[in-house]
Amino acid sequence: MDQHFSQEVKEWILDDPDALTAAQLQSWLDSDNEIELRKSFNGFLQFGTAGLRGPVRPGPSGMNRAVVARTSAGIVAFMKKQGLTSVVIGRDARHGSKEFAVESAAIFSGAGIKTLVLSHPLPTPVLAFATNELGCDVGIMITASHNPPQDNGFKVYLGGVIDSISYRGSQITSPTDSLIADEILRVNSIKSLVRADKWSIVEDQIIEKYVTRTARLAMNPGKLKIVYTAMHGVGTETLLAVFKKAGFDALILVDAQAQPDPDFPTVAFPNPEEPGAMDLAIEIARKSHADLVIANDPDADRCAVAIDDPLVGWRILRGDELGAVFAQVIPQNSSLGVFANSIVSSTIVKKIAEQRSIKFEETLTGFKWISKIQNLSFGYEEALGYCVDPETVNDKDGISAAIYIAQIATDLAGDGKTILDLLDEIWSVHGYHATEQISIRVEEISQVM
């Protein structure tokens, strides 16, 4: 191990506010474990429009308290230059999420920022809702969404107008990410950052407001038998509250996946798009003769649906198929309403919008761009992201998508039809739109460049 690298590690250890990660680095240093140290010091974890996301491990290349503190301090500097004064922080139930939320809250409150913290692990859409509903300038969500269990992340939402961009409780876009990244790079000592415990816990009334608003999407509850899985994430509590408020009582939980578990023990990857991820839910649906399977990813901002297809048996609807279903039935709130999807999605929603005389816009990849469309009525991306109620959550929301598809299936059943029948009607008008996802997983971005 060369002396320059060894000194870099020693300096980080001295500045690490977390005794546990500092001790781990010191142990690797003492045992001359350069392999692990190089993994932890492979450059700084890069901050971008998706915030931070990476493996939970010591050093500048991982998600840990030191990196979270440094990032929070950079956001504080950005906020002060922009005249922003308040933040709300949420978290999922992944490894390190609670510690990272507390560290972030300590940095923000120590800098004099009004800091609110959601009471317990909750879906990402609740944080997006709270950012707007509480009138906060910034929202922070500690989550890695549907990443593998060893990962965690740090997402940033904005509540107002920055650089002429109206955020309204949506994720940051360029150039805001670069402005924040520049401030993060200017943070020197991590250990000497002022920390305080002056944050406030947000009362659960904010959850009740979200539940009430979202439940209004379903005005005619039925008796469909629906299987639900939270994929070991944080969706169960909130989704059950929404369905109960809306009058849907016949939910069958996948008990083995209903409660938060950061190890995601029953799935290879906690992503409903992954082959096999919904097998357990589909097996329960088959045995119970259910009408529908609904799945959220671990932070419940995405929604997957499986149906019993007479031709092939139970299958998962592709994201574009579900997008077409929503676009066909979602009401046009006004002549100003706009449908939108990203360039990686099908062209079917554009055709449906044209037939319904609804304005349509196509955006760059990522829901952060869809959320910036003014007068958005419905937005989606093929990766199971749907915004069916932008007035409540101006971002993808797996809970609202779930209750809405339950209502759609109920209404169709009342007419003696199914979701497949509706899709057939759509294809008969616009032509069949085939779609298939191909996923290639790599450890480093350089492998695909």
Q: Each PLM stretch: what is its role?
A:
Residues 3-104, 111, 201-224, 234:
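An N-terminal, well-structured beta->alpha segment
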Residues 88-151, 242-305:
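N-terminal small/polar loop signature for handling phosphorylated ligands or for N-terminal nucleophile
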Residues 12, 16, 20, 36-45, ...:
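Gly/Ser/Thr-enriched, mixed-charge loops and adjacent short helices
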